A protein has these predicted regions:
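Active-site-adjacent structural elements that line small-molecule/cofactor binding pockets in enzymes
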Residues: 1-221
Length: 221
């Protein structure tokens, strides 16, 4: 059913769909659908992706079920990015993924580039084109203390499965906060290490922050 839904989205978007896949770390998400978190590994994910690719190729998965449509617009199916944050999962995904779409908590571009280098080497060893290298981070625009407090509040709300004292301990160094100019400088640092794409995760429902980011990104050379 997921393969069918993704193929349909690819068709409706004219072949512009990119899919992020990850095992996730919130056990309640698995409980909500009756899945066992212990079975959700990168290796199991590879098996599921293999089935989806067979569906997209028009193969019969079982003798009793006809091929499932529609066919995706993109040959072989939509681009798949693995939500990997470590070297082991990155290497294991090289056989089937088209790149990375993880998250950086502390915005350390040196550490991020080390993971990108692992991906570059793994994709080359697998005989595949260079990987798409995406990452993401939470952000808040504004005066330093107010923006950092905004990120902290968001983390407290979002990470409600983690003890509050743990969230409070990680909040000062998790995500990004600062001025418009500082955000542009940060994005340029990620561009310098070959980042293909940065997903900026809002920490406020204030649409003005999203509009400001859109203007800033549009002005980056």
């Amino acid at each position: 059913m997921l393969a069918k839904a993704l193929a349909t989205a690819d068709m409706l978007s004219g072949g512009r769909l990119t899919v992020g896949i990850g095992s996730g770390g919130r056990e309640e998400d698995y409980r909500a659908v009756g899945a066992d978190p212990k079975t959700q590994t990168i290796r199991d994910m590879a098996d599921r992706v293999a089935v989806m690719k067979r569906v997209w190729a028009g193969e019969k998965i079982t003798e009793s079920v006809l091929p499932v449509g529609p066919a995706p617009v993109q040959p072989g199916g939509p681009r798949l990015l693995i939500g990997a944050t470590g070297p082991k999962s990155t290497r294991m995904a090289a056989e089937w993924a088209d790149g990375l779409a993880g998250i950086t908590l502390d915005l350390d571009t040196g550490r991020q580039n080390e993971l990108f280098d692992v991906a570059r080497a793994a994709w080359a060893e697998a005989g595949k084109p260079k990987p798409h290298l995406a990452t993401s981070f939470w952000f808040a625009l504004g005066e330093a203390d107010a923006a950092r407090a905004q990120v902290h509040r968001h983390l407290r709300h979002y990470m409600n499965w983690i003890p509050p004292e743990f969230v409070d301990a990680m909040a000062p160094t998790t995500g990004w906060s600062g001025s418009d100019e500082e955000l542009v400088a940060t994005l340029r640092k990620f561009a310098a290490i070959g980042t293909s794409e940065v997903h900026l995760i809002p920490t406020s429902s204030d649409l003005d922050q999203v509009r400001r980011v859109a203007d800033l990104v549009g002005d980056i050379d």
